[in-house]
A protein has these predicted regions:
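Acyl-donor (CoA/ACP) binding surface of acyl/acetyltransferases
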Residues: 1-32, 37, 50, 63-177
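Active-site rim helix/loop that mediates acceptor-substrate recognition in acyltransferases
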Residues: 38-60
Length: 177
């Protein structure tokens, strides 16, 4: 299943994407708002990639390898929908991470719209959520641009900064498009 947007080419993540996953998730800059920090080594990236591949097999959706349509062989990010317990009632999570070289171009917003379209139109989901560090203003703006509303906050033991919980239901998404 491949999705193309105005500028993006999205395809299910594959084992051949390991080097790209490691380059993006091992970069400390892409983890400025993630207290867990960057992936420590390529073996850790492999373990994460293996879990993402299993999620595709189990659920029929998961992280996409994100490329520009003009260069579909070059992975510039990963993101999509995953089953992840957000809080007591929400378990479908929108997430994304892009290479620093493409930050500030509106690609996260374009990916978020595509993921929401896919989730509501193809998967027939009722609700999609996202969590973001409360101080990650750029990512919060992305979620707000696609119509997600903040519905709560999560405090995490050992972390000074909590996460904001955003959500959108299918009907609201239809009115945003």
């Amino acid at each position: 299943m491949i999705i193309e947007t105005e500028r993006l080419y999205l395809r299910p993540i594959a084992q051949t994407d390991l080097e790209s996953v490691w380059a993006i998730y091992g970069d400390p800059q892409t983890h400025l708002f993630n207290p867990a920090g960057p992936y420590p080594d390529i073996a850790y990236a492999q373990a994460k990639l293996t879990s993402w591949l299993a999620e595709w097999s189990r659920n029929g959706f998961g992280n996409w390898a994100i490329s520009l349509r003009s260069a579909p062989a070059e992975v510039i990010g990963c993101g999509g929908l995953s089953r992840r317990k957000v809080d007591e009632t929400r378990n479908i999570n929108l997430g994304y991470r892009f290479s620093t070289e493409v930050w500030g171009q509106g690609l996260a917003t374009e990916l978020a719209f595509a993921a929401l379209d896919y989730g509501f139109e193809q998967l027939k989901l009722a609700e999609i959520s996202a969590t973001v560090r409360e101080n990650h203003l750029a990512s919060r703006r992305v979620l707000e641009k696609v119509g997600m509303l903040q519905v709560g906050s999560l405090a995490e033991e050992g972390h000074k900064i909590g996460s904001a919980v955003y959500t959108i239901v299918a009907e609201r998404h239809r009115t945003m498009r």
